[in-house]
Amino acid sequence: GDAPYIKVPDTLKAMQQIAAYYRKKMSLPIIGVTGSVGKTTTREMIAHVLRGKYKVFETIGNQNSQVGVPLTLDHLSSNDEIGVLEMGMSEPGQITILGEIIHPNMGVVTNVGVSHIEMMGSRDNICREKLDIQNGLPEDGSLLLNGDNDMIRKHLSYVKKPYEFYGFAPDCAYRAENIREENGQTHFTFCYNSQREDMVLNVLGEHNVSNALAAIAIGLKYDVPMDAVKQQLSTFSGQRQNIINTNGYTVIDDSYNASPDSMKASLKILSDFHADGRRIAVLSDMLELGPDAPSYH
């Protein structure tokens, strides 16, 4: 046809450069979220909490790749006040590239597991790749890290930006205590400095409490009032976990993706769930685990 076009040597690079240019024109703060597992739910929770105060732009679906992030940024508008973008990777160097496109003001690293270990070679390599989210941060940028992850703790000397921990460990700045499940909801006490707040989540599992801690931390950093944070968290449902009651059976559908860490988290929900009868786990295989796949299974 007669449509104008621009001829480029590399269409992917061109798309990324256009997206980076577009992002630079927008002054809104953006929070980048990465991690082997938990990044989508954490990103959704952060966005939900921030909606207690702002008009929020967030990743569309799971468009967190080298192609997906530029496509997502295409939908950014001048009405948006704050952004929460997911940053995925399957090969070395990809998080740095996404950081150059997004230029996040803050980076969140949820977890370092074994997803994509086939391409990355080791958990150490995966960890350093995830921590490369710091490369795209501005001078005054900072990190929020999962303080319960062994790999993140191991590689702290690699971190060149100010950081805070969230999690269950005693030295985490944003902490949860007294976690319990009641009537299909998760209750916990949020601890920050000398502050103590009772929180209610509509999703199950300790891993979701961890995700919620990241969301609360970001909410407080961006001045969302605590009452609004509580209200937003209590109405969060997320895309990942559906609980269906039918004919006396309870089905917990947590089937979006499978890695050893997410599988363990789902099995813990199943074992903690109050049931009068049998508990049945329906599991698929887990991909991209390399030569250690049998032992992970």
Regions found by a protein language model. Name each.
Residues 237, 255-297:
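Active-site beta-alpha connecting loops in nucleotide-dependent enzymes
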Residues 1-17, 273-275:
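N-terminal leader/targeting and accessory segments in enzymes
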Residues 15-18, 46, 50, 72-73, ...:
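Buried hydrophobic packing segments
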Residues 59-60, 85, 201-202, 216, ...:
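Thr-Gly-centered strand-to-loop micro-motif
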Residues 15-19, 43, 66, 95, ...:
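A general structural signal for well-ordered alpha-helical segments in protein cores
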Residues 13-143, 147, 151-159:
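Phosphate-binding loop of NTP-binding sites
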Residues 1-3, 108-250, 276-277:
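Acidic, Mg2+-coordinating active-site environments of NTP-dependent enzymes
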Residues 5-7, 30, 56-58, 163-165, ...:
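Conserved beta-strand scaffold positions in the cores of enzyme catalytic domains, especially
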